[in-house]
Amino acid sequence: MFFKNLQVYRFTRPLEQDIDTLERNLEEFKFKPCGSQDISKLGWVFPMGKSGSMYTHIAGKQILICLKKEEKMLPAGVIKDQLNERVEAIELEQGRALKKKEKDSLKEEIVMQLLPRAFSRTSQTFAWIDSESDMLYVDASSTRKAEELISLLRKTLGSLPIVPIQLKNQADVIMTDWLTEGNIPANFALEDEAELCSALEGGGIIRCKQQDLLSDEIKNHLSADKFVTKLALCWADSISFIIGEEFALKRIKFADVLQEQNEDIDKDDFAARFDADFALMTGEIKQLIPAVLAAFGGEQSL
């Protein structure tokens, strides 16, 4: 139970629901599989999967929830081919060109006919509510995926007073200064990956991997017209990640020595290991995020 990505949000006021109420509300919007005519379905599942019996997993004031999504797979090419065949046949029969509205209606019919036979794929997105610090963390690689969970959570709770974390300073300017000056914040270390974007429209993007980010080559790019928009960092020799200009952490990796702290727990005891890993992860992230915020000059006041 270790998040691989972090989309970070701040509660503008404390979450007012107690655990029992939250549990009931989540159950009301529990996951139900797609019916024959459903394109997709969203709902809450037990964070511990088959080993769980609750829609929340609690460790102190830390609450873990899990969204499940099922999507029917309808290849666009198949729909397009069938639509073209039907349009061609009808136009030939009626001796006229079909209007856009008629084509759209035909397309909808084709989708409805294909849905019952379509394969489906499922995915899960975890979120962690830190009721102690009034934060919400979503393990999602994109804002769009995080918003999917947030939208259902807002519907589930009736309201969800959160805003994305906002920095006082521009992240790209701060990261550019770090590489230009070689002045990395204490307790952080550069890794070997970055993305540099031109300040000029259409000026290009440079993606660096396995690169010395303090080299003259990188500095030459920065002294021209480039800004650092993504940067690989390691904090306290414990957690490595890539941070972007929108304050999202991706490709998070917890050091082996950190994860091995729970190796003494019997692997067959899934519940105990899950609980210990969640407690370990939340404890580390609750130290990491304030350190990252401080490195970037602090959080903008609400």
Swiss-Prot record:
<dbReference type="GO" id="GO:0003690">
    <property type="term" value="F:double-stranded DNA binding"/>
</dbReference>
<comment type="similarity">
    <text>Belongs to the RdgC family.</text>
</comment>
<protein>
    <recommendedName>
        <fullName>Recombination-associated protein RdgC</fullName>
    </recommendedName>
</protein>
<keyword id="KW-0963">Cytoplasm</keyword>
<dbReference type="GO" id="GO:0043590">
    <property type="term" value="C:bacterial nucleoid"/>
</dbReference>
<dbReference type="Pfam" id="PF04381">
    <property type="entry name" value="RdgC"/>
</dbReference>
<dbReference type="GO" id="GO:0005737">
    <property type="term" value="C:cytoplasm"/>
</dbReference>
<dbReference type="GO" id="GO:0000018">
    <property type="term" value="P:regulation of DNA recombination"/>
</dbReference>
<comment type="function">
    <text>May be involved in recombination.</text>
</comment>
<keyword id="KW-0233">DNA recombination</keyword>
<dbReference type="InterPro" id="IPR007476">
    <property type="entry name" value="RdgC"/>
</dbReference>
<dbReference type="GO" id="GO:0006310">
    <property type="term" value="P:DNA recombination"/>
</dbReference>
